[in-house]
Amino acid sequence: MLIRNERFEDYRVVEEMIKKAFWNLSEPGCNEHYFAHQVRKSEDFIPELDFVMEEDGQVIGHILYVKAKLLATDGTVKNILSFGPFTIHPDYQRKGYGRKLLNHSLEAAKDMGYDTVVIFGNPENYACYGFKNCKRYNICLENNLYPVALMVKELE
């Protein structure tokens, strides 16, 4: 098993893997592969936190991060991270690969000086990694909503 930074020549394989993993998962079809494609063009994309996982020379996992901000009610801004899509090929899910890839990426983020990650994700998938509901940190959307899927992890 190898974790390395994604390269341009990986993009198509990664997008096909994302499509396979998310197809018809929570709604008909999916758009996560297109989202990953677009994120790579964003000025907030962090190439140093764009990882693939290989097993026997085949890409089986992927995660990418973007810069984000939290705006406090007093106007102060905190620079944070968000990630997604986070994907493990369906044939390799529930075998510990996701945990290894996520932990590797979180350590790399911490090494770069980041201390907070905020994501939209299924709590059943992320609570075991230390992500907690946003309400615990008084982090909400602009309209004071605290969605269950808005989750926070402090990097310690």
Where are these regions (language model features)?
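C-terminal "cap" of GNAT-fold acetyltransferases
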Residues: C140-E156
